């Protein structure tokens, strides 16, 4: 969710399945500031939901200053994020194909794995329009391995 997108939500975050008996600390909403407090040792975090590269809601804020910044601050080294609305089935296909490409050739890098997945989606006439594949980008350590 982008900052200000829902009433009462001042910062970007992820809407999770709420617990049966929610509390103030466990309400089903993981805000960017809550993410930043996590201690992660994550090589790659996939944020394939809508607008995960959006700004933090501050007027004039840069992209990636919201949820993405929180994950980097928490310890993620790479992120897959989206720059706008995503179509759910296309997001599933692109992330699945991207992870397969990365598993097959990890030394090629995360960005290359995404490029290959985008190419496969573009080759399908039902998903050739950029609406389906263009929202996604790898940020952080996405390049090829040097060794």
Predicted ranges, named:
Residues 1-147:
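Catalytic cores of enzymes
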């Amino acid at each position: 969710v982008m900052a200000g997108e829902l009433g009462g939500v001042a910062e970007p975050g992820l809407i999770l399945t709420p617990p049966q008996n929610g509390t103030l600390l466990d309400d089903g909403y993981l805000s960017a500031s809550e993410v930043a407090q996590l201690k992660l040792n994550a090589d790659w975090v996939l944020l394939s939901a809508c607008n995960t590269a959006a700004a933090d809601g501050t007027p004039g804020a840069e992209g990636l200053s919201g949820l993405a910044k929180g994950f980097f601050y928490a310890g993620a080294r790479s992120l897959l994020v989206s720059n706008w609305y995503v179509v759910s089935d296309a997001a599933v296909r692109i992330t699945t194909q991207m992870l397969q490409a990365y598993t097959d050739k990890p030394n090629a890098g995360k960005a290359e794995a995404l490029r290959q997945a985008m190419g496969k989606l573009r080759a399908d006439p039902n998903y050739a329009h950029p609406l389906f594949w263009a929202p996604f980008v790898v940020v952080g350590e996405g390049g090829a391995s040097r060794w």
